[in-house]
């Protein structure tokens, strides 16, 4: 039935503000055809405003977007220099490093790096 993930979208109350955060703070490159879309690896990531479609805005919690980086601690430091506030320190799960933060609308985000292969 389901064959792939087509895109991921986060809700926003101000898509322009969110776009600025994702471009200027996180360094994502906007898709040339979609002002509020970005290609991250092979996945399309978008920003949408629920109110413009008649839906109530609610930030996403506990459904983290895991953003891959080569070094979580270094990336966390770079983002902290840009004013991003993290929810605690870098976590080591035994297979990956993670650090949690929020976008301007309060959506949960995570820096992530898997350092151990998945086991079957």
Where are these regions (language model features)?
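Amphipathic alpha-helical segments
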Residues: 14-28
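Short amphipathic alpha-helices within nucleic acid-binding modules
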Residues: 21, 73-78
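Short secondary-structure junctions
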Residues: 26-33, 86-90
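Short hydrophobic/aromatic beta-strand element in the GNAT-like acyltransferase core
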Residues: 37, 66, 98-100
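Vicinal oxygen chelate
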Residues: 76, 80-120
């Amino acid at each position: 039935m389901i064959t792939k993930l087509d895109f991921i979208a986060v809700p926003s109350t101000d898509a322009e503000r969110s776009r600025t955060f994702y471009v200027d703070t996180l360094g994502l490159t906007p898709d040339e055809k979609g002002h509020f879309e970005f290609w991250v690896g092979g996945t399309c990531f978008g920003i949408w405003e629920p109110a413009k479609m008649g839906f109530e805005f609610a930030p996403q919690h506990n459904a983290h977007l895991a953003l891959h980086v080569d070094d979580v601690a270094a990336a966390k430091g770079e983002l902290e220099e840009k004013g991003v506030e993290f929810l605690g320190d870098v976590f080591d799960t035994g297979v990956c490093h993670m650090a949690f933060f929020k976008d301007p609308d309060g959506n949960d985000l995570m820096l992530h790096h898997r350092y151990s292969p998945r086991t079957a």
